[in-house]
Amino acid sequence: MAQGSGSASQAKFWVALLFCFLFFWENVDAATYTVGGSNGWTFNMATWPRGKRFRAGDTLLFEYDATIHNVVAVNRGGYRSCITPAGAKVYKSGKDEVKLGKGMNYFICNIAGHCESGMKIAINAV
């Protein structure tokens, strides 16, 4: 009986280890992108995502002057209209890290006139 009990304990250990591996695997492959590159989060951002392959779990790093800009995670309507929906998450540290969810992710600066001047991005994470 002792041998059977040991085998069950070993099996539980390996199953737990497998779950840990699978849980952390997604983050191992995650990338971090500095939005806007060396220019940071600024105006005329529409072309910045082109040519990049974003995945769910990747991180966007928004670097900007927090005294004049912010970052707001919005829905498609907020992105198109440059209007912040109720309950939208507003980031304002000047160095914000945002993890991408699967599908479309939309971000704007909601300081008056900034979104309308191209301070917005739409990212599709696969």
Model regions: which residues?
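N-terminal V-set
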Residues: 60-80
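Extracellular/periplasmic metallocenter environments
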Residues: 2-16, 21-41, 67-69, 80-126
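Short alpha-helix capping/helix-loop boundary micro-motifs
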Residues: 41-50
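Short secondary-structure boundary/capping segments within folded domains
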Residues: 51-52, 62
